[in-house]
Amino acid sequence: MLQQWLRQSPRAARVLRGSCCRGPQSGSLRHSPLPTAPHRCIRSLQTSATESKERIPLRKQLKQDAKALKAQKRQKRASEEASRTKWELTVGIEIHAQLNTETKLFSRASTSNTDTPNSNVALFDLAFPGSQPEFQATALLPALRAAIALNCDIQPVSRFDRKHYFYQDQPAGYQITQYYEPFAKNGYVDLFPHDGIAPEDGDHVRIGIKQIQLEQDTAKSQEYPPSTQLLDFNRVSHPLIEIIAMPQIHNPATAAACVRKIQAVLQSCSAVTTGMELGGLRADVNVSIRRRDEAPGTHQYGGIGGLGQRTEIKNLSSFKAVEDAVIAEKNRQIAVLESGGVIEGETRGWTIGSTETRKLRGKEGEVDYRYMPDPDLPPLIIGHDLISNLRDSLPTPPDQLIEMLAGTEYGLSIEDAKPLIELDDGARLEYYQDVVDILRDLQQDKDAKSRGGLARMAGNWVLHELGGLCTKADLAWDAQRVPAETLAQIIDQLQRKRITGATAKQVLAMVFDGDRRPVPQLLEEENLLLRPLSRDEYLALAEAAIGQNPQMVEQIRAKNQLGKLGWFVGQMMRMGEKGRVEAQKADEILRELILGKSDQP
C-alpha cells in the first residue's frame, strides 16, 4: 500500500529519503514488515500549516527581488552623488587604432591578421642588422582621414621619434612614433546624450584632442601557462594612430562614450577596419582624483593643471571595460586618500569581471623612454592639396547623419537613427534610404498627410522586422536577400489596406526565405489579399474575446488600464480568419464595447 502511494507521489518519496527510511542494507532482512504503529517519518509527510505559510509565490518573490534591486540602485546612486560632491574625477584617454592599410608602416609586408603566425614579416620588422625603414605612403591616407574627421589641424611637417624600451614584443628595442612633432593637433570630438554621456554632463560635452601621431604596433603575445609565451610578429610595425584625448572627462560613463564615439568616427571614414570587439582598437585611461574642497592639485597633464596624481590603466579592450576600470580605479584612489595614503604614479591593469585594478609597474616618464629623433627617417611633408581633396571626399559625419534622420525629412527617433548609421558599415542606411525613395514614388497619389509617416514606417521595417529575421537566422546583412523595391512594395500594400500587418510580416518572411515572385503575384496566388470583415463580424469576435476574461474588462473600466486592450485585440486576431482582422478596427470595436466610446458617426 505504501509503495503504491509512493509511486504516485514523487514529492513524498523525496521526503521519505531520510536516515530512518532507508532501504535495507547489505546483510539485512529482505522482507522487513511495515511498522504497525504510525512511523515518525511517515507522519512527517503531512504538510503542516507552518510550511504552507513560509512558501512564497513566485510572482511575489520576483516583485520582492525587483524592489530590492531598485533599493540597491538608489543606494548606489546616492553613494555616487555623495562621491561626486566630495571628489572630482578626471580622466584622460589614449586610443590606439590599427589603420586600414594593406602594408605595414615601414615595410612592404602584408598587414593580414588571418595568415599563419610569423609569415608576414620583413627584415626591418624583426630588426635585422642593416635593415632600413621604408615609409609606406599608403598608410598616411587613412591616418589623415581620421585626423580630419576628428577636427584636427594637419601639420605640414611632422617627424618620427624613437621611444626606447626593452620588451619581448618589440625586437628593435624601440618603437617609432611621433612624440615631439605629430602630424595632427588640436582636434575635438562632440558627445551628446544619445552617445551615452552621463546625465549630469548635460546635453553636450566637447573633449579636446591634443594630438594624433603615427606609430608602430608591437608583436602579439599568446600565453600558455604555466611558463610558455609565444610571439606572432605579423603585427609588428602594423600602422597605428595614437589619439590622445585631453583630460576633460569627469564621469566613467562619459569616458566609455568618448571611446565609443571616436571608434564610430574612425569607422565612418574608413580609417580602420575593425573596432574594439576584434582587437583593432585599444584604449589606455589616465585616472586622477582630488578633493573639491581643497586647493587644486600640483600635477598637470596635457597642458591642464591642478590635477591629482594620475595612474594609467593599460590595454582596455571594450567600452564596458573602460567604464568599469575607471570606476574601480576611482574607488581605489578615494579609499587610499581617505585612509591617509598617497597615490603613486604607476601603470595598472584591469581584468574583465574584476572589481579592482592591479599594479603592473611604476610609471615611466619621458626621461625613461629616452625619446630621440629617428635618424633613418626624413621629415613627413603633407601638402595642402592632399588635405583639401581628402576633406572634400569624406562621407557625412555621424552627427550630421543623425540630425538628418531625426529631422523633418525622415522623422526617425534617435534610437532608430543611431543603429541605421552604425550597422553594417553604412550599408543598412543606404538600403533604408532606397526603400524610402521607392516607397514615396509608389505613394505619390496619396496626400501629404498620408505620406508623412512613410519614412518612420520604413525605418521600423528595415531595422526591426527585416533586421529581426537576419538575427533569428544568424545571417549577415545582405541587401539582395530582400531587395529594397520588394520591401517598399510590401509596405505600400500595407498602407493601402490591401493586407494586414500580420500578412505583411508573413510575405516578408517568404521573400526572405527565397520566394522571388513579384509581391502582387505572391499576394494573389497565396490568397493573402485582405477581405475586410463586416462590423457584425468584428462585434461577434470582440464579444467572444471579452467573454474570455471579464475580470480584465473590469480592470480596464475601473482603472483605465487601456494597455490591456491589446490582449483582447490579440485574441480577436487569433480567433478570426487569418489575415482578415485589422488591429486598428478591432481596437475601435473593443473601446466601443468596453468603454462606450464609438468612432462611428
Curated annotation (Swiss-Prot):
Transmembrane parts of this sequence: none
InterPro entries (UniProt xref): Asn/Gln-tRNA_amidoTrfase_suB/E, Asn/Gln-tRNA_Trfase_suB/E_cat, Asn/Gln_amidotransferase, Asn/Gln_tRNA_amidoTrase-B-like, GatB, GatB_Yqey_C_2, Gln_synth/guanido_kin_cat_dom
First and last residue of the signal peptide: none
EC top class named in words: ligase
UniProt entry keywords in alphabetical sequence: ATP-binding, Ligase, Mitochondrion, Nucleotide-binding, Protein biosynthesis, Transit peptide
The reaction(s) this protein catalyses: L-glutamyl-tRNA(Gln) + L-glutamine + ATP + H2O = L-glutaminyl-tRNA(Gln) + L-glutamate + ADP + phosphate + H(+)
Single Gene Ontology MF annotation: glutaminyl-tRNA synthase (glutamine-hydrolyzing) activity
Protein name as catalogued: Glutamyl-tRNA(Gln) amidotransferase subunit B, mitochondrial
Native source organism of the sequence: Aspergillus fumigatus (strain CBS 144.89 / FGSC A1163 / CEA10) (Neosartorya fumigata)
Lineage: Eukaryota, Fungi, Dikarya, Ascomycota, Pezizomycotina
